[in-house]
Curated annotation (Swiss-Prot):
Keyword entries, A-Z: ATP-binding, Chaperone, Nucleotide-binding, Phosphoprotein, Stress response
Pfam families with a match to the protein in the record: HSP70
The protein, known as: Chaperone protein DnaK
Compositional bias (Low complexity): 601-614
Residue numbers bearing the Phosphothreonine modification: 197
Biased composition regions of type Acidic residues, renumbered to the chain: 620-632
Induction annotation: By stress conditions e.g. heat shock.
Known role: Acts as a chaperone.
Region (Disordered): 595-632
Source organism per UniProt: Cytophaga hutchinsonii (strain ATCC 33406 / DSM 1761 / CIP 103989 / NBRC 15051 / NCIMB 9469 / D465)
HAMAP family, alphabetized: DnaK
Family affiliation: Belongs to the heat shock protein 70 family.
SUPFAM superfamilies, per the entry: Actin-like ATPase domain, Heat shock protein 70kD (HSP70), peptide-binding domain
Length: 632
């Protein structure tokens, strides 16, 4: 069985890990970094960049650079409009009210864009392992609903990965944290504040069993929001001074975003930071600069409401787990945003203990995913992971009431059946409206699917017996069936993401992604070849200066002619011509080297001017110093 890689598909950064023996290890990307920015960029020449190369060009190409796409996974456009309005790229409504990113004349779904990031992770792992990778465990925020989980699975399929398991980020973190503590029984709280989402989970660890007792969170709270309060402050300051809103200009907004993120990071270790953005925007034909000093105290004041929003989910998670604060043995911080000092202070104050510093908050989730991959392949034994669903699942019943079949924080996988009936006499069919949430009425919860069970024989109301079964798998993805117990007729539905992507669409996107993967590989090979040519030009010119006077006119002329050909091929970026010219230079140098070697051999033969007939009999005195034993 091949390796199953673990991928933390993050809002801001992504990370990939794999089991090596009994250890999970993070795999560095092609830039040598252990995490990869979750950013995709499209260039005017049709080239696509992912990760650090995409991030580096964002300021000059803001409308075609996509970041934080995870915030739109499995969402409806109408429910994410406020977030869409803050993006530098253009989001518009697609079919079924799904968000689509407009790039030139093409629309991309969040799944397609996430797949490009997953492809980068897949390629990173393949280059490290030296073989193709086909399977992965991918993490999601614990509070992701069914549609968001399904969308993540679709992204994996488009990227050419078989997603063996979707697991919750805090659970993955606890798995990585607790692997070397198998002999110790403990209750841990995982406080996970990432780039776009916040989760808190309470788990019991003991004898290799990792049991999630409860989970809670907010999928609209993360590091991006902390950046936004700085952006709004900077834009507000500039507007009050100059009368212009920088957020209306995509390039200026992108510069604000990068400056805000940098300032936030610096304030984790400094009391203040200077934000200096020269030539941010012309006002009345005059270039204007934005120079501001932001103190940590001011940042904490701006972010105060965001910080307080993390505490209610902590209270609810403890309540749902039936535990008091004093029963929590360890608090684990996950996600880059937990580096904010005020967050650490509030967590310590709430739980009454210092959070554990034993894990890297940027890497621990991917490590946990890799461990889960190891469990599935059998590389990791004696580990049992018991996760839960974050939100209740049920159906709409008479009067618009939401009737729960599977309660929140139920251990998965899980299966539950309940019998319902018709609401009117001789009702020929029933509509099963599947929902997810905690509110009493259907209209206040999230609709995740509908289907019909027809051909019900005529009968008075409440007589037909319709058995509805909810079956939720280990990925937290739901299958629903409805069966008329009288006739045995059954209808099933696998709840698909509200993305509305059909199997054909997913297959089409997967084929496109595969084609692009080949194109990306070719582009990379082309760049490497061009770099080799550049290096050979430099080395050849250097060697001609050094050894030119030792070469015969013929050999020197051959090298110079081949060098000229290589320069022309390099300028034209003609790979075939580069290969030919490089081969010609190598051949010419081989001939020249042979000539120089023969000349040197001839100079050292008997009969040379030195008149020596053998090794010299003379002895040269050298100084000798005995080394003291202590210095050895």
């Amino acid at each position: 069985m091949g390796k199953i890689i673990g991928i933390d598909l993050g809002t801001t950064n992504s990370c990939v890990a794999v089991m090596e023996g009994s250890e999970a290890v993070v795999i560095p990307n092609s830039e040598g970094k252990r995490t990869t920015p979750s950013i995709v960029a499209f260039l005017e020449n049709g080239e696509r960049k992912v990760g650090d190369p995409a991030k580096r060009q964002a300021i000059t190409n803001p409308t075609n650079t996509i970041s934080s796409i995870k915030r739109f996974m499995g969402k409806k456009f109408s429910e994410s409009k406020s977030e869409a309005d803050r993006a530098t790229y253009k989001l518009e409504a697609g079919s079924n009210d799904t968000p689509r990113v407009r790039i030139a004349d093409r629309q991309y779904t969040p799944q397609e864009l996430s797949a490009m990031i997953l492809q980068k992770m897949k390629t990173t792992a393949e280059e490290y392992l030296g073989h193709e990778v086909k399977e992965a465990v991918i993490t999601v925020p614990a509070y992701f609903n069914d549609a968001e989980r399904q969308a993540t699975k679709e992204a994996g399929q488009i990227a050419g990965l078989e997603v063996k398991r979707i697991i919750n980020e805090p659970t993955a973190a606890a798995l990585a944290y607790g692997m070397d503590k198998k002999g110790k029984d403990m209750t841990v709280a995982v406080f996970d504040l990432g780039g776009g989402t916040f989760d808190v989970s309470v788990l019991e660890l003991g004898d290799g069993v990792f049991e999630v007792k409860s989970t809670n969170g907010d999928v609209h709270l993360g590091g991006d929001n902390f950046d936004e309060v700085i952006i709004d402050w900077l834009a507000g300051e500039f507007k009050s001074e100059e009368g212009l809103d920088l957020r209306q200009d995509p390039m200026a907004l992108q510069r604000l975003k990068e400056a805000a993120e940098k300032a936030k990071i610096e304030l984790s270790s400094s009391a203040s930071t200077e934000i200096n953005l020269p030539y941010i925007m012309p006002v009345n034909g005059m270039p204007k600069h934005l120079v501001k000093t932001l103190t940590r105290a001011k940042f904490e004041q701006l972010a105060d409401s965001l910080i307080k929003r993390t505490l209610d989910p902590c209270k609810q998670a403890l309540k749902d787990a039936g535990l008091s604060i004093g029963q929590i043995d360890e608090v684990i911080l996950v996600g880059g945003s937990t580096r904010i000092p005020r967050i650490q202070e509030e967590v310590e104050k709430f739980f009454g203990k210092k959070p554990s510093k034993g894990v890297n908050p940027d890497e621990v989730v991917a490590l946990g995913a890799a461990i889960q991959g190891g469990v599935l392949t059998g590389e990791v034994t004696d580990v049992l992971l018991l996760d839960v669903i974050p939100l209740s699942l049920g159906i709409e019943t008479m009067g618009g009431v939401f009737t729960k079949l599977i309660e929140a924080n139920t251990t998965i996988p899980s299966k539950k059946s309940e019998v319902f009936s018709t609401a009117s006499d001789n009702q020929p069919s029933v509509e099963i409206h599947v929902l997810q949430g905690e509110r009493a009425f259907a209209k206040d919860n999230r609709s995740i699917g509908r289907f019909h069970l027809g051909d019900i024989p005529p009968a008075p109301r409440n007589v037909p017996q319709i058995e509805v079964t909810f079956d939720i798998d280990a990925n937290g993805i739901l299958n629903v069936s409805a069966k008329d117990k009288g006739t045995g007729k059954e209808q099933k539905i696998r709840i698909e993401a509200s993305s509305g992507l059909s199997a054909d669409e997913i297959e089409r996107m997967r084929n496109e992604a595969k084609a692009n993967e080949g194109k990306d590989r070719e582009e990379k090979e082309k760049i490497e070849k061009i770099n080799q040519a550049d290096s050979m030009i430099f080395q050849t010119e250097k060697q001609l200066k050094e050894f030119g006077d030792k070469l015969s006119a013929g050999n020197k002329s051959a090298i110079e002619a081949s060098l000229e050909d290589l320069k022309k091929a390099f300028e034209a970026k003609d790979i075939s011509a580069i290969d030919t010219a490089m081969a010609a230079i190598n051949t010419a140098w081989q001939a020249a080297s042979q000539e120089m070697y023969s000349a040197e051999q001839g100079a050292g033969q008997p009969g040379a001017d030195a008149g020596q007939s053998g090794p010299s009999d003379s002895v040269t005195d050298v100084e000798f110093e005995e080394v003291d034993g202590d210095k050895k």
